[in-house]
Amino acid sequence: MVRDITECSSPNLFDPEDTILNNLSYHLLIGHGDPEMIKRECILLLKDLEALELDKIKSFVEESIIKDYVNEQILPSNKPGFQLSTWVGNFGEVLASQILIDSEGFWFPIYKLRYREKTSWAMKLTDLCLIKTNGLSKPLICYGEVKTKSSTCDIQLGIKGHDSLVRDDALQDPEILKFFCTVLYSAQKYEEGEFFSKLRLQIIDYDKEYRLFLIHEKSTWKEDVLSNLNSYELSSSLINFSVTVVLVEQLRKLIDESYSRAWKSVEGWIKNG
């Protein structure tokens, strides 16, 4: 199944209050790191500013410290020498998750990007793992691969995404499920941890589906991507496989602007305690 979700209402890149951009930047931040850790580490960095008496200077320095921390310690880099594909790809994973959550009722996205050893490294793990339980007789597990292209078109993109999804199926790797459980219990997310324990221990039945998201710059998209995938021999292991195409105008600018706003969420966490 192929669904074409073309952005009909583009966010305003110049509006600091744009809800679409601010929502994406928030989820980019929490997708890369634990909110409580981020907040506490920023508070530690800001302690030396308590003696400053000039509010304008203090506010400027606080903003600079938070921005530097988020950009250097949490988010991937888009500077020369680093993998730009990580910068672009991580955005795609977050956008795809939000589409599933907002439009289809999935919950609790597990992003592989949070568990990389380094922020600019790739990790061998399914891009997306989300759960849907409401209104279903059995839980539905969605595994997804996301391919994001913000520049030229690669007509083999769909085939590459399909092959990645076949390779990185978490349900076929008990160590990955155990890893999920360990992380969730350590974070005191007991409900979610118990759910994955039931999967790992084969206590509950569940349905599963596989999604391939192709997030692409609208101006360079070619239907050849889907034509090539349609003529490709698909793996029988991908149960309920579907493709979702998301075409976005000025995708690279949207990505960069979303990252640049991520620090604002930290500022709000600190002010609200």
Where would I find each of the regions flagged by the language model?
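Nuclease-adjacent, charged terminal/linker segments that flank catalytic cores
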Residues: M1-K67, I74-L75, L254-G273
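A short, highly charged nucleic-acid-interacting micro-segment common to nuclease
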Residues: L75-S97, R114-T119
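Conserved catalytic cores of phosphodiester-cleaving nucleases, focusing on short active-site segments
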Residues: L100, L128-L130, C142-T148
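A short acidic/basic microdomain associated with nuclease active sites
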Residues: S103-W121
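Charged, often glycine-rich, active-site loop that binds/positions anionic groups
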Residues: S120-L130
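Short, solvent-exposed loop/turn segments that connect beta-strands within catalytic domains
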Residues: N134-L140
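Acidic, metal/cofactor-coordinating or nucleic-acid-engaging core segments within structured domains
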Residues: T152-E223
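Non-catalytic C-terminal interaction segments of nucleic acid-processing enzymes
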Residues: E209-G273
